[in-house]
Amino acid sequence: MSEFELDARRMLCPMPVIKTQDKVNELSEGDQLTVFCTDPGALNDIPAWCRINGHKVIETKEINDEVIVVVEVGSV
């Protein structure tokens, strides 16, 4: 398992989800991706995308005006 980060700050919906999808497609099953966003909708949108696409959300949190979502890549 490897860990990766994606900076999706200052991007508005739907770009954080699209960038997450693009990055996940480059990774292997079991890898973890931490996504940093400033779009509050990403707190719901990225986990919903993960459920639909077979990935696991490890953690979601809001710190100040930032949303952080940690995703474990499933089999793609």
Where are these regions (language model features)?
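Intrinsic-disorder/low-complexity, polar/charged segments enriched in Ser/Thr/Lys/Arg/Asp/Glu/Gln
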Residues: 1-3, 30-34, 66-68
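An N-terminal amphipathic alpha-helical segment
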Residues: 1-27
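Amphipathic, hydrophobic secondary-structure cores in small proteins
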Residues: 19-55
